[in-house]
Amino acid sequence: MLPPDPLHPLRPFLKNFVWEHGHIGTRYINCVTGEISFDDGKKSRFAAEKYLYVPLDKDATDDPLVTGPATQDAALARFLRAAQLGKPEEAGSAAEVQRAVHDCLDLAIFSAYQHDALQAVDHYTQEAMFDDEIRAALVDDIRRVYTPMREQLALYDFTVLHGLPTPLLFSDSPFIDWRVRVKPAMPFVSLPLGPYALLIGTPSGRTSRAAPVAWKTAVSMGVLKDHNRLMAERARLWIVATSDDQLIAIQDRFKKDDA
């Protein structure tokens, strides 16, 4: 009996982008080739890249055999579905929603540091270092940057914006830090939960645990109008969308010259 397919860390989010009317599957663009494709079924087979996991807790023991952050999958799936449907009453209790948002952030940061992790491995493998030394150096590099970020975000206030008028793109690097990605800087971070739902984090000013998650219906994109552009700019491997038109609009960014 074959072992089950390994689950991509972002698979819980990708489920909200599966087209389930008639031909079931996901529309995506390959950022390496610029090819637009339709992935049949619900497995998101195009999202097959390997992840390097680094535990970000300061005192956490690094175990290379651990493949990702611990998440409560059932509660996370319920929260993501409720966000996409715009039904907070179906998201679970306040505590369950807070835990789901915590899991979302851990997965978002997990995806955010993959490029840095791969670059670090490429760099250290060219040095005269043993495998365990390479791993230790990688862990130090990632923790130096992303542990403070994770601690800061743990104190943010979070809002689920649902019913967005424009469908969102979702990529292999879906977390957007608007504090550094746009000028002038905007004081929030975001993560798509589905085509029409977005998790927004803003500074709370508190030094203890953040407040309960808020839910708001979006009446316009407002300052989020650049979301899809920023998503396309940071993508390295793939981008999913709800329509081919969305992907065609960004295809020139990824098309390779024939010459």
Please describe what each predicted stretch is:
Residues M1-A259:
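Alpha-helical structural context detector biased toward long hydrophobic helices
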